[in-house]
Amino acid sequence: MSMFCYQCQEAAGGRGCTVKGVCGKTEDIAKTQDLIIYVVKGIAIYSSQVREIGLNTSEADKFIVESLFSTITNANFDAKALNARVQEGLKIRQSLKDAIIKAGGSYNSKENKSWTSKFLSVLGIKNDKDEKEIHDAAVWAANNPEDFKKKAETVGVLATENEDIRSLRELLTYGLKGMAAYLEHANNLGYDEDSIHAFMEKALVATLDDTLSADELTALVLECGKYGVDVMALLDKANTSTYGNPEITKVNIGVRNNPGILISGHDLKDMEELLKQTEGTGVDVYTHSEMLPANYYPAFKKYKHFVGNYGNAWWKQNEEFEAFNGPILMTTNCIVTPKASYKDRMYTTGVTGFEGVKHINASKDGKKDFSEIIEHAKRCSSPKEIEKGEIIGGFAHNQVLALAPQVVDAVKTGAIKRFFVMAGCDGRMKSRNYYTDFAKALPKDTVILTAGCAKYKYNKLDLGDINGIPRVLDAGQCNDSYSLAVIALKLKEVFELEDINELPISYNIAWYEQKAVIVLLALLHLGVKNIHLGPTLPAFLSPNVAKILVENFGIGTISSVDEDIKMFMN
C-alpha cells in the first residue's frame, strides 16, 4: 500500500498525498509517522490504567506529547530519529505493562474484584464472556526498521474503512497533535496539567475502539476543544509568568553588520537559552516566522544583541535562509526541504529533525548547549538586508484589555464597526493571496485581530489606525489565539451580551496544520459559530462530518473577497 496523508491544508488534489508529501516527506517517513501514532495509542492503553491506580506516568506522558508533536506537518523528516522513536515507544509500553503486572499482586484481592477484572483485561486475558481482548496496538512487537515497515503498512489512516469514523478519528488525532505541541512548550517551562494528559490518553484509546459510534466520537472531538482551551491557557500562563506579558512593540525588520543566528519555530525556552548563550559573543540574534512574537516579551528586551525579525512566513525560508548567511536554529515546525546552499548552516532541536542536518539535544536537566551554532555564526558573514523598517505587535489579551476603555468607546461611537479574527497559518498556495486582498479591502472602520503566521499576509501593509488603535492587532503565535478568545469573552461581558456570537466579530481563519485544528476545536467549545476556514476545507472532513460542522456550528469556507466582505458586514 502506498502512503496516504491528508492532515494538512496542502493535501494533494484536496484529497491526500499518496506518492510523496507536498511537505516533502517520503513514503517511508509518512508510514513511520503512522506507526509512531499507533505505538502511542498502544502506550495510552496501558498508561491510562497505570494513571488510574496512582502510579507514575511521567515518562509515558512525555513520550506521548513529544511523539504526537514530532508527526505534525513539517516537523521531522529524519527517518533514523523517527525509527528510534518507535523503538523507544515499544520499550515504554513494555515498562507500563510491567508496572501493571507488579501492581496486580497488591491490588488483586477479594476486596477489589473490579481491579482483578480490569487487571486481567488490560493484559489481554479473557476472564469472562464480556471481556474484550486487548488491542493489537498494545501487544505487537518488532525490533528493527524492516519489521517496522511491514507493520506500518497495516496501521495507516486508511486502515479505518468507514469514511465517517475515519474522518472523526483523524479530526480527533489532529486536534491531539496540536494540543501536544502547546503542552510541550508549557512543559519546557515547567508547567503541566495532569487532566490534559489523561484526556489525551482517553482520546487516543478511543480511536482504537470499533464499538464507538459517530455520535460518541463527535462528542469526544468537541471535548477535545475543551482541553484545547485548557492547554492554551496553560501555555499562556507559562509564557507570561516566565517572560512577562507581551506589550506593544515596534520590531525592527532590518539587519546589522554583525554575524547572526536566525531562530525559527515556537519554543520560547530555546529562545531564552540562545539569547543567554550569545550575550557578549558578538553574535546577533534574529527571529523568523512564528518566533516573531518573542520580540513582544519584556524579558527578552534586555538583550542588546536581539536585533528583531528577519523574513516572513515559513514557506519563504528557502530564499530567506540563503540570504541570511548565518546559521539557522529550527526549534519546531515548519521545516522546508533545505537547499544545499545553506543546509550545512541549519540546526534542529527538540522534536524537529531533517536527515543530514545537525541536531542539538537537551541534557538530562533540560539544558541545551548552543556553543557549536554560536561558533559557526562567528565564521559567517552578516545577514543580507532583504527589507527595512518596523512592524508593530504585542496585542495579547493583557495589553488589549489595558486598552479596553479606548476600544469599547470606539465600538460604542461607531468608530470601530467590526473586528475580524484572521488568525491561523500562512502557506505557499497562491489562493492564500486572498487574505492580503481581503485585509486591503476591509472597510476603514474595521480592525483585524490576528495570531499565528497568517499575519504575514498583511502585517507589513499600511492599514492605518482608528483613534490610535492599529487596524492590525497581532496577539502573537498561533497558540495566542487564546488571547483573541479572552478578548472576545471580555467584550461580551462589557457589553452585557448573553452570546459571544452577538459581538461585532467575524472569523475568517486561514488554516494549514494541526495546531490550527486544536484552535478551531477550542473556538467551537467556547461557542463561537460561523467560522470561515480557508483557503479550502480540510480533506480529512468527510461529507457527513463536514455537514455536522456546517449545520451545528455554521462552519463555512471562502469565496471572493468582495462577496465575503459583503456577507460578513451584513
UniProtKB/Swiss-Prot annotation:
Q: Which residues bind hybrid [4Fe-2O-2S] cluster?
A: 266, 290, 334, 425, 453, 478, 513, 515
Role according to the record: Catalyzes the reduction of hydroxylamine to form NH(3) and H(2)O.
Its protein name is Hydroxylamine reductase
Keyword 4Fe-4S tagged: yes
The membrane-spanning stretches of this chain are: none
From the Swiss-Prot or TrEMBL record, state where the protein is found.
Cytoplasm
Q: Which gene encodes it?
A: hcp
What keywords tag this UniProt record? 4Fe-4S, Cytoplasm, Iron, Iron-sulfur, Metal-binding, Oxidoreductase
Pfam families assigned to the protein according to its UniProt record, in alphabetical order: Prismane
What HAMAP family has UniProt attached to this entry?
Hydroxylam_reduct
> Where on the chain is Cysteine persulfide found, per UniProt?
425
| Catalytic activity line of the entry | A + NH4(+) + H2O = hydroxylamine + AH2 + H(+)
**EC number(s) given by UniProt:** 1.7.99.1
**UniProt source species:** Clostridium botulinum (strain Okra / Type B1)
Q: So what family is this one in? A: Belongs to the HCP family.
Q: Where is the signal peptide?
A: none
Report the coiled-coil segments. Answer: none
Looking at the record's lineage, which domain of life comes first?
Bacteria
Q: Per the entry, which co-factors are needed?
A: [4Fe-4S] cluster; hybrid [4Fe-2O-2S] cluster
| CDD domains named in the record | HCP
The record's GO CC annotations read: cytoplasm
Which positions are annotated as binding [4Fe-4S] cluster? 5, 8, 17, 23
GO BP terms: namely:
response to hydrogen peroxide
Ligase is among the record's keywords: no
Q: Which GO terms describe its molecular function?
A: 4 iron, 4 sulfur cluster binding; hydroxylamine reductase activity; metal ion binding; peroxidase activity
